UniProtKB/Swiss-Prot annotation:
GO terms for molecular function: structural constituent of cell wall. The keyword Protein transport does not apply. Its main location: secreted. Keywords: Cell wall, Disulfide bond, Secreted, Signal. Residues 1-17 form the signal peptide. The keyword Signal applies. Disulfide bonds join C103-C164, C110-C158, C111-C144, C165-C178. InterPro entries: Hydrophobin, Hydrophobin_CS. Aerial growth, conidiation, and dispersal of filamentous fungi in the environment rely upon a capability of their secreting small amphipathic proteins called hydrophobins (HPBs) with low sequence identity. Class I can self-assemble into an outermost layer of rodlet bundles on aerial cell surfaces, conferring cellular hydrophobicity that supports fungal growth, development and dispersal; whereas Class II form highly ordered films at water-air interfaces through intermolecular interactions but contribute nothing to the rodlet structure. Pfam families: Hydrophobin (PF01185). This is Class I hydrophobin SC6.
């Protein structure tokens, strides 16, 4: 459970999401020894994967300072060095005037931002999600929620990025297989 949650958090950070996480299962990310000024978070990930995430800055947002300015140490299940030098280069997409209002396929989603699938480290994303992402094309949405086009009120409008997603969804944190132009006419 903890590994799955940390993997989802890491993937969210891979696409630029900033999830607020205080406690993941039995791992309190803010558990800091006040006398020594250090804490240890054992993710249970392999050293290679963990080092790769750290080298790419993908866990930086999880390691926030406590009131005394201390940052917990993060450890994996080994101390191997990462050999991957890939970085995340996707930028947030800006809303457009041609946002879809209905989808030919998939579901209409309101996403905080999107990134081109071709711009991500597929090996890392596949490892973190536990699915084959080799054939994913189009956009990857982050922090998405369904949009209802019928009626008014909450959920009927989107002030950020509206897309149609027909791929896997990981609790709305990450949506695969999204398109911005998949509109029914």
């Amino acid at each position: 459970m903890v590994s799955r949650v940390l993997a989802l958090i890491s993937v969210a950070m891979l696409v630029g999401a900033r999830p607020y996480v205080q406690n993941v299962g039995d791992v309190d990310l803010n558990d800091v020894d006040a006398t020594v000024g250090t804490g240890v978070v054992d993710t249970g990930m392999s050293g290679d994967l963990l080092a790769g995430l750290l080298a790419n800055g993908l866990l930086a947002d999880l390691l926030s300072e406590d009131a005394d300015g201390h940052i917990p140490e993060v450890t994996g299940s080994s101390t191997e060095e990462a050999t991957s030098s890939s970085t995340w280069s996707g930028a947030s997409s800006k809303p457009t005037d041609s946002a879809p209002t209905q989808c030919n396929s998939g579901t209409l989603q309101c996403c905080e931002s999107t990134t081109e699938a071709k711009d991500i480290d597929r090996v890392l994303l596949s490892t973190l999600l536990g699915v084959d992402v080799g054939s994913i094309t189009g956009l990857i949405g982050k922090n998405c929620s369904p949009v209802s086009v019928v009626g008014v009120g909450a959920g009927s409008t989107c002030s950020t990025q509206t897309v149609c997603c027909d791929g896997d969804s990981f609790d709305g944190l990450i949506n695969l297989g999204c398109k911005s132009g998949n509109v029914a006419v």
